[in-house]
Regions:
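Compact, glycine-rich, soluble single-domain proteins
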Residues: 1-167
């Protein structure tokens, strides 16, 4: 999908990275993934939906993996974890309630990552935001988790909303 992209933002909303996105949306694409590819060019990414773990068998390059949780109807989802520098021939598992992941070249996910926005050629849109570890249990109940500017200062840039009320 040529027109798909992922953009990374810091807590201030500044764009800190953009990726040309390959959506792994068929059985064959998901099965093959990045196997056998000699490199993952900086600026490229692979999106796996409905995926809570990955294998690095026959993959020649290390990757950074951004794991995201369940999306709400308006397309918001929490970033649950970032696995950095996952090496070839390893398995990597997302945290509980992972719904998908974004794979990029190792070392390219900035420490200041606060949110990602994924736009696919089929007009799908997903916005994922980092949530503090103390609030990750909210995801278990599939309650809306999204950025909340009025409490962002004391929660490290993100907060959880439960039925429209900030936690």
């Amino acid at each position: 999908m040529a027109d798909s992209e992922a953009r990374l933002f810091d807590a201030t909303g500044k764009n800190i990275g953009s990726y040309k996105l390959e959506v792994m949306d068929t059985f064959w694409k998901r099965f093959m993934g990045l196997m056998g590819r000699p490199e993952m060019p900086i600026g490229d990414a692979a999106l796996f939906r409905n995926c809570s773990s990955i294998h690095m068998f026959f993959i020649k390059i290390p990757l950074d993996v951004i794991w995201y949780g369940p999306a709400t109807p308006d397309g918001h989802a929490p970033i649950l974890a970032v696995s950095r520098d996952v090496k070839p021939w390893q398995l990597s598992f997302g945290p509980k309630h992972t719904q998908g992941c974004l794979e990029v070249a190792a070392g390219t996910v900035p420490i200041s990552l606060d949110s990602i926005e994924i736009l696919t050629a089929s007009s799908d849109r997903l916005k994922a935001t980092v949530i503090p570890p103390d609030y990750r249990d909210v995801v278990r109940d599939r309650i809306q988790v999204t950025r909340c500017s009025d409490t962002a200062a004391h929660l490290g840039g993100a907060a959880a909303l439960v039925h429209g009320r900030a936690l």
